[in-house]
Amino acid sequence: MTKKKAYKPGSATIAQNKRARHEYFIEEEFEAGLSLQGWEVKSLRAGKANISDSYVTFRNGEAFLFGATITPLNVASTHVVCEPMRTRKLLLNKRELDSLIGKVNRDGFTVVALSVYWKNAWVKVKIGVAKGKKDHDKRDDIKDREWKLDKARIMKHANR
């Protein structure tokens, strides 16, 4: 009988898109698989990914992650052409695809990548159905965040 693999402590998150939550209202989140090549998996294990400018496009009833950068390792194979900005296919159920395509086409939403992470041995992408924020919405968010910090500071000093 084989031994169980030891749990590796640490974060399963490979990359996050913090800008997305600042620039968009995230209405709904989905988890999607990601179709990768071998060198991309090795680079993701090393944490060399950037999804800050990535979004999802739809072609022929399929979803593709566009704009994500996976930097190849220096020791990558020479007979494989490593394309860091390659468009990668997202693996979703038909029902989820239909829902996303409908929201993008009818309601004017966009779909952005929020994070890339490991789930067991699989790389998953958390995507969000989003609507763009206006400048005044961003300012309101900043005001709310600052007031929350001030309120916590006031309550801390009031309890002394």
UniProtKB/Swiss-Prot annotation:
Pfam families: SmpB
GO cellular component assignments: cytosol
First-listed, main subcellular location of the protein, grouped into a coarse class: cytoplasm
Name of this chain's protein: SsrA-binding protein
Record key words, sorted: Cytoplasm, RNA-binding
Gene source species: Yersinia enterocolitica serotype O:8 / biotype 1B (strain NCTC 13174 / 8081)
Protein biosynthesis among keywords: no
Listed SUPFAM superfamilies: Small protein B (SmpB)
GO MF assignments: RNA binding
Gene Ontology terms: biological process: trans-translation
Family: Belongs to the SmpB family.
Coiled-coil ranges from the UniProt annotation: none
Location of the protein in the cell: Cytoplasm
InterPro entries per UniProt: SmpB, SsrA-bd_prot, SsrA-bd_prot_CS
CDD domains membership: SmpB (cd09294)
